[in-house]
Design a protein with these regions (language model features):
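Conserved Nudix-box catalytic region and its N-terminal flanking loop in Nudix hydrolases
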Residues: 16-58
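Conserved N-terminal beta-strand and adjoining loop/helix that marks the start
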Residues: 1-20
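Short connector loops at helix/strand junctions that flank enzyme active sites
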Residues: 3-5, 27, 79-82
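Short helix-loop capping/hinge motifs at secondary-structure junctions, enriched
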Residues: 16-17, 92-95
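Short histidine-centered beta-strand/loop micro-motifs
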Residues: 21, 74-76, 95-98, 115-116
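Nudix hydrolase/Nudix homology domain
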Residues: 29-30, 97-137
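Short, well-ordered beta-strand micro-motif
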Residues: 10-12, 86-88, 108
Length: 137
């Protein structure tokens, strides 16, 4: 079986420093907001919907940055593709989704790297960080 999820590395500037949005999932992991693609949805539609559902934020997605990882979820016998974009918030009223998300907050670059547990996600984050720095003149 195969599944696909989409989300984004959401960032903002705070006092000239980049901050990144992480969600703390009820399973104990920190991640960037993302979720399953529903039937008939595009990657962009999924990304916008999931960020809104998980954090209450409306965002502008930059589709010029798109990274994908694939991995096997042994416990469910599923091959999963996760697609990540970068995005900036249009609204700033953070409210975490009850049930799935226990907390959502903004963190600096170094803190994000300590909270994310998976090397492939950190690798995508570093690529996104380089991309964001290149467009943030």
């Amino acid at each position: 079986m195969k599944e696909k999820s989409c989300g984004a590395i959401v960032y903002k500037k705070e006092n000239a420093e980049l901050k990144f949005l992480l969600v703390h999932q009820s399973n104990g992991h920190y991640s960037f907001p993302k979720g399953h693609v529903e039937e008939g949805e595009t990657e962009l539609e999924t990304t916008l919907r999931e960020i809104k559902e998980e954090t209450n934020l409306d965002v502008e997605v930059d589709t010029n940055f798109r990274e994908q990882i694939s991995y096997f979820v042994e416990s469910r016998n599923v091959m999963k593709d996760s697609v990540y974009f970068v995005a900036t918030p249009i609204t700033f009223d953070l409210i975490n989704q009850e049930g799935e998300i226990t907390e959502c907050d903004w963190y600096d670059h170094e803190t994000v790297k300590t909270k994310i547990e998976f090397a492939d996600i950190i690798e995508i984050f570093e690529k996104a960080y380089i991309y964001i720095k290149s467009i943030d003149k």
